[in-house]
Amino acid sequence: MPRRRIIGQRKILPDPKFSSELLAKFINILMINGKKSIAENIVYSALHQLSIKVKKKELDIFIAALDNVKPVVEVKSRRVGGSTYQVPVEVRPVRRNALAMRWIIDAARKRIDRSMSIRLTNELLDALENKGAAVRKREEVHKMADANKAFAHYRW
């Protein structure tokens, strides 16, 4: 136990355009080498293109796509005796958002398109329609947790 006070998690500043903390976190995860303005331009142009295609507000589209990718359960390794079990555990809300954002960005980076904004637009559109690599990743994680349901009593 630390003798000094426990330092809480730093509050993230909301993004300038939509004043959303979720979107600011997404921009921070997308950012490479501290180039935040480039990451902001990519995200904002992707959301603008998406709003033209879907004809809804940008932030509503983003949140809906994120909700379709969020995992409910995941597996964690737990060593019992001499063997390691994959124990299914429920995902905390903060980690849910972080995993969903990371999976969307990774899937967008693996796509083959001209620019990152187009790749991100297509991946968010796929996530909105419950298809695409990010949604496949969530289904894979859920399937893994379902297969290891027998070890749920090892939860800690």
Swiss-Prot record:
This is Small ribosomal subunit protein uS7. Keywords: Ribonucleoprotein, Ribosomal protein, RNA-binding, rRNA-binding, tRNA-binding. Pfam families: Ribosomal_S7. The keyword Transferase does not apply. It comes from Buchnera aphidicola subsp. Cinara cedri (strain Cc). NCBIfam families: rpsG_bact. GO terms for cellular component: small ribosomal subunit. CDD domains: uS7_Bacteria. One of the primary rRNA binding proteins, it binds directly to 16S rRNA where it nucleates assembly of the head domain of the 30S subunit. Is located at the subunit interface close to the decoding center, probably blocks exit of the E-site tRNA. PROSITE patterns: RIBOSOMAL_S7. Part of the 30S ribosomal subunit. Contacts proteins S9 and S11. HAMAP family: Ribosomal_uS7_B. Belongs to the universal ribosomal protein uS7 family. SUPFAM superfamilies: Ribosomal protein S7 (SSF47973). PANTHER family: RIBOSOMAL PROTEIN S7. GO terms for molecular function: rRNA binding; structural constituent of ribosome; tRNA binding. One of its GO terms (biological process) is translation.
